[in-house]
Amino acid sequence: MASKADVKKVLDRLQIETPSWAYGNSGTRFKVFGQPGVPRDPFEKVEDAAQVHKHTGAAHSVALHIPWDKVEDYAKFAKHAKDLGVVLGTINSNTFQDDDYKLGSVCHPDKKIREKAVRH
């Protein structure tokens, strides 16, 4: 069994990328439930992510989801994150809500739908 010191060393190196949607309203596949204090825009989501990183030291990166985290100036957005001590990480595109993606997006049986997903 690993000692507490060994476990702590591993945890000190642990880095987690949190998804931006984790800082918004949540719910089930049937309904999203509004909550007070939820971020109103991507900049506020990053501010919440910075608080998580401040308290854990392990969540320095935030994965974005487009179109929900779309902003006009990504350089300004990245600087905002950096100023707060976090970075913008993975970019996830929404290739699942469009009706065309009912049978998948980049693996759809219809070549036109696959191409649409790639263009997205």
Regions found by a protein language model. Give the residues of each.
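N-terminal pre-domain/capping segments
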Residues: 1-120
